[in-house]
């Protein structure tokens, strides 16, 4: 482990002891907001401290086993035991080191939030819409594995199956490091390209088509409240499904336009106009916040191009090659030959690799900052 990381962990331990004292102080207990904030910080620091304690313990075990091996020159049985313990300790240390590095990465407060996932068909016509349906299935299956709640906010099915566009909301508990739906799926934003033989292809030729995905953190309710109602144009219309067949005979579908930015959100999934309006306003708020974030990120990117990318829709991030059973993430040069499993929601390896790559970037930035550059 690099010295600056160990120094950071030592400071975390000192902070944990400080939090123990603060949480028992009368003035803190009487201030509910401060008490909650410190309790959350204590919970996160405790997880880090537990892992760091395990790391130092295994490092001590490794040193002891190496000493035993040095003294066991004439005792093959003891030498074998020592070598076995050395191998096990090194494996544990490597895993704990990686876990701690991820824990030390500065937390994005949005990582714990629920998220809106927007999937849009792009180039490729009907095949692109079918692939949008496949991505919808992939993400919902991944949500099931994580026991997240999934809600369809709006959908525009294509006539041959799949979607021209579909917007989902996903919510669920955070993991031990405080990462929730948005933190897991944030790196899915961008262009997704598929190479396969379409069901409608009679000559067996491989076609290439594409979809775009945008993952937006759900903003606080306060953000939605800050939108000036005078800046909104609200239109209602009859909800309809594929082929233009009416789902109901009332104007329950809602389209909201934010006039200053031209951003539009709509919802027709619910029979209640009131609930559709509330959902559309949620999506609109998320898109406005994301527009602001994207503009700031673009300015930052002009100074430093990140490995994982900006998350812009125009970034081609991934290729799904069905004939070869191959998925390639172009941002980190990751190639996996388990495409069918991934399409069934087995996204864990992909997401972890992206988180590790982004973490390495952030750790490099931390090290640079700690060295005073």
UniProtKB/Swiss-Prot annotation:
InterPro entries noted in UniProt: PCRF, Pep_chain_release_fac_I, Pep_chain_release_fac_I_sf, Prokaryotic/Mito_RF, RF-1
Transmembrane segments: none
Organism: Polaromonas sp. (strain JS666 / ATCC BAA-500)
Any GO molecular function: translation release factor activity, codon specific
Function in brief: Peptide chain release factor 1 directs the termination of translation in response to the peptide chain termination codons UAG and UAA.
One GO CC term, this protein: cytoplasm
PANTHER family for the chain: LD18447P (PTHR43804:SF7)
Protein name, UniProt field: Peptide chain release factor 1
Post-translational modification: Methylated by PrmC. Methylation increases the termination efficiency of RF1.
């Amino acid at each position: 482990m690099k010295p600056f990381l160990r120094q950071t962990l030592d400071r975390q331990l000192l902070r944990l002891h400080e939090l123990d004292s603060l949480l028992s102080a009368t003035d803190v207990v009487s201030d509910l907001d401060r008490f909650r904030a410190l309790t959350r910080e204590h919970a996160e620091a405790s997880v880090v401290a537990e892992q760091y304690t395990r790391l130092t313990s295994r490092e001590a075990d490794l040193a002891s086993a190496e000493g035993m091996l040095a003294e066991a020159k004439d005792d093959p049985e003891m030498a074998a035991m020592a070598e076995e313990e050395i191998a096990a300790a090194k494996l544990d240390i490597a895993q704990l080191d990686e876990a701690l590095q991820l824990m030390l990465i500065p937390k994005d407060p949005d990582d714990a939030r629920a998220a809106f996932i927007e999937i849009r068909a792009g180039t490729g016509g009907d095949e692109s819409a079918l692939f949008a349906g496949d991505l919808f299935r992939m993400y919902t299956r991944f949500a099931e594995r994580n026991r997240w709640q999934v809600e369809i906010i709006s959908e525009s099915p294509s006539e041959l199956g799949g979607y021209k566009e579909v917007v989902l909301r996903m919510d669920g508990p955070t993991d031990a490091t405080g990462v929730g739906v948005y933190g897991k799926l944030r790196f899915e934003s961008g262009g997704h390209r598929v190479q396969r033989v379409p069901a409608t292809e009679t000559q067996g030729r491989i076609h290439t088509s594409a979809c775009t995905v945008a993952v937006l953190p759900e903003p606080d309710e306060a953000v939605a409240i800050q939108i000036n109602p005078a800046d909104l144009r609200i239109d209602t219309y009859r909800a309809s499904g594929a082929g233009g067949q009416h789902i109901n005979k009332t104007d329950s579908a809602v389209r909201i336009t934010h006039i200053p930015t031209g951003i539009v959100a709509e919802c027709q999934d619910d029979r209640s106009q009131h609930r559709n309006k509330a959902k559309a306003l949620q999506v609109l708020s998320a898109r406005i916040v994301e527009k602001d974030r994207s503009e700031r990120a673009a300015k930052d990117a002009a100074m430093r191009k990140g490995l994982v990318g900006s998350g812009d829709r125009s970034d081609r991030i991934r290729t799904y090659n069905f004939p070869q059973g191959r998925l390639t993430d172009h941002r980190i040069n990751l190639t996996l030959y388990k495409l069918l499993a991934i399409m069934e929601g087995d996204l864990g390896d992909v997401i972890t690799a992206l988180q590790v790559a982004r973490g390495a970037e952030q750790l490099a930035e931390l090290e640079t900052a700690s060295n005073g550059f």
